[in-house]
Amino acid sequence: MSDIERLEQEICLALEMAGDEQALEAVRIAALGKKGSISEKLKALGKMSASERQKVGPVLNGLKNRVLELWTQKRDFLRRQAMDACLTRETVDITLPVRSSPIERGRIHPISQVIEEIIAIYMKMGFSLAEGPDIETDYYNFTALNFPEGHPAREMHDTFFFDVNKTGERKLLRTHTSPVQIRTMEKQKAPIRIIIPGKTYRMDSDATHSPMFHQVEGLVIDKTSTIAHMMWLHETFCKAFFEVSSVKMRFRPSFFPFTEPSMEVDIQCDRSGSEVKFGEGQDWLEILGCGMVHPHVLKNVGLDPDEYQGFAWGMGIDRIAMLKYGMPDLRAFFDADLRWLDHYGFRCFDMHAFFPGLRNV
C-alpha cells in the first residue's frame, strides 16, 4: 500500500469518527489546512521532476477532491442530525382531543362562509380584494360619491355620526363600503377591478335590517366597460353563488347618487314553498343595486369621464346568506346563540373543499 493510499484511509476513518462539526473541522484542517497532510504533499510536488509531477499530481488532486466531498457530506449529515434532535427536543403537542358533544364543536358563521364564497367567485373572474376603515369622513362617505348636501342619508336619524372634533370635522360610521372605491381610485391607476366586503352601519333594526350589517361592493374602471359587461357579470355571479345552471334577471331603472344610469336587479325565483328556489318559478326577488359610475365621481378622483368609464354594484351579504341558506330572521345572526350556530353554522372538518357552498367554482 502506497503512502497516499494509507493517508486516504486515515483521513476517511477520521471523518467517519467525527461526532460533531467541531471535530469534523479539525479533520479538515489536519488534512487540507496550510500545514495539513495533503497540503504538504502538494507543496512537495515542486521538488519533483516533471515526470514524477505528472504521475503524482493527479493522484494528490484526486485525493483532495474526494476528501472535500466526504467532508461536505459528513457536515450536512451532522447538521441534519442536530436539527432533528433539536426539533424532537423542542416539539410541543398542540392538539386537543376531539370533543364528543356536537354542540361544543366550533362552527364557521354563515356570514364568514358567504363572504369566502363571494370572494372565491369574483377572484376567479379576475377581481382583487380591497379594504378600508369603518370610521369615515363626510367627504369619502358622501361628498366624493356625489351625495348632495340635503340628501336624507346625511341626517342624524339615518347615519351614526361622531361628535365634531377639535378641527371642526365630524366623522361617522360608514353607511356603505363605497368610500373604499374612492380611496382605491385615488391611489390606483386604471384599469381597476375590485370587490369590497365589509361591515356597514345604519340606524335601522327589524327582521330584515340591522344597525350593523355586511355589504359587498364591486368596481370596474377602464376605457371600454359597458352595461352589457355589467349584466353578464351579475348573471355569472348569481349562477355560481346560488348554484343554478341558468337564471333570469330583471334590471329596473332606479336612482343612486354615484351611478348614472342606475338599476336595481331582480332574480327570478319560486317562493311558493317553505324555501326560495332560484332558476325557476314566476316570482322576482331584489338581489342588488348597480349602475355606471357617475361622471362627477370620476372627476372627484381625478379621472377624465370622457376617457374612463366603468360600473359599480353593491349587495347585502346578510341578505343573500338568508336567501341561500334559508334563515328567516337577520337579527339571529348577531345573537351569539350557540343553538342557532349549531344549526346554521358550517363545521370546519366536515368540509370537502375550501368553499363547500360552491360546487361550480
From Swiss-Prot:
Entry superkingdom: Bacteria
Matches recorded under SUPFAM superfamilies: Class II aaRS and biotin synthetases, tRNA-binding arm
GO biological process: phenylalanyl-tRNA aminoacylation
Catalytic activity: tRNA(Phe) + L-phenylalanine + ATP = L-phenylalanyl-tRNA(Phe) + AMP + diphosphate + H(+)
Cofactor note: Binds 2 magnesium ions per tetramer.
PROSITE patterns for this protein: AA_TRNA_LIGASE_II
UniProt EC number: 6.1.1.20
Entries under InterPro entries matching the protein: aa-tRNA-synth_II, aa-tRNA-synth_II/BPL/LPL, Phe-tRNA-synth_IIc_asu, Phe-tRNA_ligase_II_N, Phe_tRNA_ligase_alpha1_bac, Phenylalanyl-tRNA_Synthase, tRNA-bd_arm
Enzyme class: ligase
Subunit composition and interactions: Tetramer of two alpha and two beta subunits.
Protein name: Phenylalanine--tRNA ligase alpha subunit
Organism from which the protein derives: Bartonella henselae (strain ATCC 49882 / DSM 28221 / CCUG 30454 / Houston 1) (Rochalimaea henselae)
Gene: pheS
